[in-house]
Amino acid sequence: MNPSPLLDLIDSPQDLRRLDKKQLPRLAGELRAFLLESVGQTGGHFASNLGAVELTIALHYVYDTPEDKLVWDVGHQSYPHKILTGRKNQMHTMRQYGGLAGFPKRCESEYDAFGVGHSSTSIGAALGMAATDKLLGGDRRSVAIIGDGAMTAGQAFEALNCAGDMDVDLLVVLNDNEMSISPNVGALPKYLASNVVRDMHGLLSTVKAQTGKVLDKIPGAMEFAQKVEHKIKTLAEEAEHAKQSLSLFENFGFRYTGPVDGHNVENLVDVLKDLRSRKGPQLLHVITKKGNGYKLAENDPVKYHAVANLPKEGGAQMPSEKEPKPAAKPTYTQVFGKWLCDRAAADSRLVAITPAMREGSGLVEFEQRFPDRYFDVGIAEQHAVTFAGGLACEGMKPVVAIYSTFLQRAYDQLVHDIALQNLPVLFAVDRAGIVGADGPTHAGLYDLSFLRCVPNMIVAAPSDENECRLLLSTCYQADAPAAVRYPRGTGTGAPVSDGMETVEIGKGIIRREGEKTAFIAFGSMVAPALAVAEKLNATVADMRFVKPIDEELIVRLARSHDRIVTLEENAEQGGAGGAVLEVLAKHGICKPVLLLGVADTVTEHGDPKKLLDDLGLSAEAVERRVREWLPDRDAAN
């Protein structure tokens, strides 16, 4: 571990405030080095944290946390905050089972004012805290720290609109690094990055190209020209940012300050001290660089957004979570990405939509091959779904690639704008089930429950890679709204067809014939069901569809077996197991049924296998639970 004499003194923001302001740049260097060391060992979100070091130090130096409230949007950039608030010695446990969460979590620290993980919630939460303080006659300050990527979501502007009309002491810090996970899209980022600045950069490049050879021959001239160039760039950027941003945010009722260099910690302290003394809604526009201080991350902030580890000093390259070593088995995301490109090559009506998750959802190749049919709408899930509805109305075939946890954010649009009108929109629902290190805010445990009650919806859950392709093709050709949900990570190793074969909608298949006990399994739980069935001589049905569900198969299994076990990687409440019970009740069948899913609990973060075991859904746990449930404890016999 690199020596860090200042950082070693800090176990709380109170310790931080004992430092002289002139010591803060040195502390920032030590904190950045500590991040490189700790994230290099544990993995986790990387580039965004490097870009927020000075801002985090300045905020805790000026504001009286935890009395004053800091609300971090999304939480990708919260590692420096955790280090400065007493969790430095636990950073080696980051995102591991039983260790620190990768996002702010209220039950983890009094300094984590609001639990986050999803985008664009910070302004609304901080506004609620500020309003409470006003009602109680307090004098605390509430601060929302939000990135320019998160500002592309409507919820952020809803909160700005509300805050500007309220007489509360609220500071919104706009951390502008021109990135979310991928480069930002839409009109707002273009608004923040002015045309004048781009024109100035172009002019300077032209001047350099035309005069560089001459200046090289004059001693000292090139160095002087570079200083002038830098000054012109800085002045142009500051003037244009201030002019445009002032107009936007002051029209919302905020007093605008900025733009300010987000890596000049001493100046940030001065600016924040002034802002803390002001009354009413304030907005501070801070310019930072994602990955600051680590050249590889600065040059490729998308790749280094999240990492698995760092190389030893002098190492050539850092492997990223987004580019794992080649695996023999493809991930479900890769299967979807290939199917999407294959389908688009055969059908010019296919269009793909993502809410700012191009890399994570497997759309990089599609964007490269079909740029005119690729739509990244920013962090705007609600708009993504309604936009897809408009495309479908005019004869296009939209595919919305979205994580299960983020589809929750667009539920009204899914119901009102898609399902009630029976529009043929296909939802490719990635990260369904347990996701591991990202924890409960990113777990996809509710989609079967909230999708199967929606009229006109087709809901499918593949059990392996090839079935994923089959069900994508099947649901794409259905003249109805449909969702195919699949888990994070690699599949089972099943050979994947290159064709566009389809299956009958609403029909499952028998994977194994057995006696007495029937496993009715959905999606990712088919594999553990088969493993357990071998030991218990049980029948296994791969249902494929949750809606419409195969009533005929369920009734046949119920009448030919003594008992039924349902398995799903979804909440038990309202899930696929409940659908099976509804079928049995409808047909007047009374048989013992064991529902195996995620109980009514908030899951933790950590290794997915460990989490599944704790939830009773690993093959070993399923076998144990079934044996305990069997009336005669004699397995299936």
Swiss-Prot record:
One of its GO terms (molecular function) is thiamine pyrophosphate binding. It comes from Neisseria gonorrhoeae (strain NCCP11945). HAMAP family: DXP_synth (MF_00315). Its EC number is 2.2.1.7. Thiamine diphosphate binds at residues 76, 117-119, 149-150, 177, 294, 381. GO terms for biological process: 1-deoxy-D-xylulose 5-phosphate biosynthetic process; isopentenyl diphosphate biosynthetic process, methylerythritol 4-phosphate pathway; terpenoid biosynthetic process; thiamine biosynthetic process. InterPro entries: Dxylulose-5-P_synthase, THDP-binding, Transketo_C/PFOR_II, Transketolase-like_Pyr-bd, Transketolase_BS, Transketolase_C, Transketolase_CS. Pathway: Metabolic intermediate biosynthesis; 1-deoxy-D-xylulose 5-phosphate biosynthesis; 1-deoxy-D-xylulose 5-phosphate from D-glyceraldehyde 3-phosphate and pyruvate: step 1/1. Homodimer. Pfam families: DXP_synthase_N, Transket_pyr, Transketolase_C. Belongs to the transketolase family. DXPS subfamily. PROSITE patterns: TRANSKETOLASE_1, TRANSKETOLASE_2. It catalyses: D-glyceraldehyde 3-phosphate + pyruvate + H(+) = 1-deoxy-D-xylulose 5-phosphate + CO2. GO terms for cellular component: cytosol. Its cofactor is Mg(2+); thiamine diphosphate. Keywords: Isoprene biosynthesis, Magnesium, Metal-binding, Thiamine biosynthesis, Thiamine pyrophosphate, Transferase. This is 1-deoxy-D-xylulose-5-phosphate synthase. Binds 1 Mg(2+) ion per subunit. Binds 1 thiamine pyrophosphate per subunit. Catalyzes the acyloin condensation reaction between C atoms 2 and 3 of pyruvate and glyceraldehyde 3-phosphate to yield 1-deoxy-D-xylulose-5-phosphate (DXP).
